């Protein structure tokens, strides 16, 4: 049994979460540099950042997969999980949020709170991830720390509490005032750009520092009654008391500590690392996570080395040298290489091959992983993202992650027959890595269909097939994932009876079919009294309804948000069978749903466009042409922000159109928001197209 090197209270599992251009990868890089793990600093500008280790990321300069990296700072082990900042990859963000204990939210001092930041912030709230804010790019023209503070309060509805304020901004950004110690840290560029000196607070920011120190003390005093008493008695709080108060508020998420700097110029990173170890939680300081047993009994899993092993597989990657890597977060107990673990979701035993700690794309072999740690396992056969690995003595299932349903599909075909098999293997591996990506076969055309969260998502999948698996694929036109639903309640009787010599078939059902609120899925209720339909046939009725849902009513799209109640029927002693009841239910459902005002639903995307004012009219006119509904118009740093809902069907190729309309000066972000009924004329077109 290996010994634990870092005690649990000195472990920090953190993520760097941010909008696409806030400088997240650069910040992660600098953290690795200052913690001594990385010798040549990688720059995103020249495509060499250690964190971005997949080729497409290097080209696009956006971070796609969360690489988990272990670094050390002042005796603390910091496991850094890099999260993507582009909306097509929200699944990756969700997945990393699930295993983080704390996060550093990076904002650009010029761009402030971007639409994407709101999505990431919501996800962090959902998983109760305490966070600190780092306002980056303080050296840029238009940098304004205090405006970002205001935006966090207004747009994210958080309580930002600066624990530093900047000294100067733009070209004059020299350093920061530490409001806890009331000292200035100044980076003198000429000497070593990474080193800073501690000085007295410069006269020009003294008043501002006093004002913000008072705000900090007030916020801190609200976290604890004894501090509140001292505050009202006018007594000074000690440095230790202030730190304790900041941490308490941060863990309860009533305070969001704010720091600033410029990662690119190496300013502000050391104090940021100090804040990570001082204010973000250790694994044993966060709430225990919930698990269930197979019989539905709930249980809480405390973060501790004692007790039976339990871990969550949160990421699967294919590494060109080692094969498949499964990243796990250990919540309880420990795991040794060469041992066995039980996958409680797939219900099978897994042999643990080698255990690795990853440093971006370098790896270190280890013999054991302990509670609170993150590492990668080589050689797991059946484990998927979101599965639990546990001890056979305590088969707990840790809470599952929710994965969104794909909204866009394209048909792919290999360019040569020889690639057919290679493509199937490639797609299977990619689908294992990414649960928001699905592969299916179109029954009518026999084509392979891939589905995902957006155009960029699928582009990158096709790109990876070529690079990693050497499969060159032709890609068809994007198809929208429409759905169907009903608008009114109906009752439907259906009798399925066949008598043609020998044993017949007999199934007879009465179904009540009703609409449910949006995003409710499917609900089946058995309301049979007096055994008019025997118990053993009820599951067949439900199965028949479910199968009918899949093939749709109007145009063959899946039906959702429907409740079906089986309330009457009859059976035949000899001729009734599961098959007969399944068919009766399936045909009955289809017939009933047609009378229940069936409609087609389409995915609506939340679109935000940032454009210079002179193009605003064109952009809005174009969105209206695409059946968009403009919700709001806003000013942000001299550019106009247009927020709208648009049907996905109208948004293909939007980036190219927007570029030509605004001479490349506008940017946009788009994510799936909800399903909405399509207008009648569009519905008729869809039905005509589908039914040929």
Swiss-Prot record:
**Which residues are noted in the entry as GTP-binding?**
18-25, 82-86, 136-139
The main location is cytoplasm
Q: Which Pfam families match?
A: EF-G_D2, EFG_C, EFG_III, EFG_IV, GTP_EFTU
Which ranges does the record mark as transmembrane?
none
Quote the subcellular location field of this record: Cytoplasm
Q: Name one GO molecular function term.
A: GTP binding
UniProt KW keywords: Cytoplasm, Elongation factor, GTP-binding, Nucleotide-binding, Protein biosynthesis
> Per the record, GO CC terms?
cytoplasm
Domain (tr-type G) ranges = 9-284
Q: Where does the signal peptide begin and end?
A: none
- Does this UniProt record's set of keywords contain GTP-binding? yes
Question: What CDD domains does the record point to?
Answer: EF-G, EFG_III, EFG_mtEFG1_IV, EFG_mtEFG_C, EFG_mtEFG_II
The GO biological-process annotations, alphabetized, read as: ribosome disassembly
What the record says about family reads: Belongs to the TRAFAC class translation factor GTPase superfamily. Classic translation factor GTPase family. EF-G/EF-2 subfamily.
State what this protein does. Catalyzes the GTP-dependent ribosomal translocation step during translation elongation. During this step, the ribosome changes from the pre-translocational (PRE) to the post-translocational (POST) state as the newly formed A-site-bound peptidyl-tRNA and P-site-bound deacylated tRNA move to the P and E sites, respectively. Catalyzes the coordinated movement of the two tRNA molecules, the mRNA and conformational changes in the ribosome.
NCBIfam families noted in UniProt:
EF-G, PRK12740.1-3, PRK12740.1-5, small_GTP
- The molecule here is called Elongation factor G
